[in-house]
């Protein structure tokens, strides 16, 4: 099932209900457009070198230079473990799993009663990033480069995420009242 786009203001509320570590991971994903697995595999050494560094995407093997904004950067430094910024709870030599972040996000989305018809996952942050980048730059090719997509068609799907979510909801609010 595809992940859905979520209004950034509502996503902010949902992120506030996560554990601090998972909230930080998703905020880094929102700021950089990285997949959650790539965020979780950021090593402490990389962050200690500065706010700008290169990440090798785990899904595609492509290299990508990213910049971490100051607030997120200092939070990453504070929480950084010996090997990874997001350490695994059992083995510090391994990163936190994307499933752990997924589970926490699902719990928070349920807590905030985000519509049952929406599939909110860590990939939602990447879709929000894409929609915001398109609003800022207005060019599909620019967003494609930011997401490191090989095909503009893939990027177009991300850019349509907001409209697809609106169609899916058909006038229903994203947050349900009691």
PLM region spans:
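DNA breakage-rejoining catalytic core of tyrosine-based enzymes
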Residues: 1-11, 61-70, 82
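Alpha-helix N-cap/helix-start motif at helix boundaries, enriched for small hydrophobics
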Residues: 25, 37-41, 143
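DNA/chromatin major-groove-contacting recognition/catalytic segments
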Residues: 1, 67-71, 160-178
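Major-groove DNA-contacting interfaces characterized by cationic-aromatic clusters
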Residues: 73-104
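Basic, Lys/Arg- and aromatic-enriched nucleic-acid-binding interface segment
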Residues: 4-32, 36
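Short, polar N-cap/turn motifs at the start of nucleic acid-interacting alpha helices
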Residues: 47-50, 139-159
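Conserved tyrosine-mediated DNA breakage-rejoining catalytic core shared by Y-recombinases
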Residues: 41-74
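Short, basic (Lys/Arg/His-rich) helix/loop patches that form interaction surfaces
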Residues: 16, 103-141, 145
């Amino acid at each position: 099932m595809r992940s859905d786009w979520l209004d950034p203001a509502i996503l902010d509320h949902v992120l506030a209900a996560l554990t601090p570590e998972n909230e930080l991971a998703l905020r880094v994903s929102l700021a950089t457009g990285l997949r959650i697995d790539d965020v979780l595999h950021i090593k402490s050494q990389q962050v200690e070198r500065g706010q700008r560094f290169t990440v090798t995407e785990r899904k595609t093997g492509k290299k990508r230079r990213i910049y971490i904004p100051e607030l997120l950067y200092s939070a990453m430094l504070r929480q950084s473990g010996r090997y990874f910024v997001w350490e695994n709870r059992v083995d510090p030599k391994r990163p936190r799993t994307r499933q752990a972040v997924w589970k926490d996000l699902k719990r928070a989305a349920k807590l905030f009663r985000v519509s049952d018809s929406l599939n909110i996952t860590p990939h939602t942050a990447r879709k929000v990033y894409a929609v915001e980048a398109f609003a800022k730059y207005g060019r599909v090719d620019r967003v494609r480069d930011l997401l490191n997509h090989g095909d503009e068609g893939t990027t177009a799907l991300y850019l349509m995420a907001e409209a697809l979510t609106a169609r899916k909801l058909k006038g229903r609010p994203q947050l349900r009242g009691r």
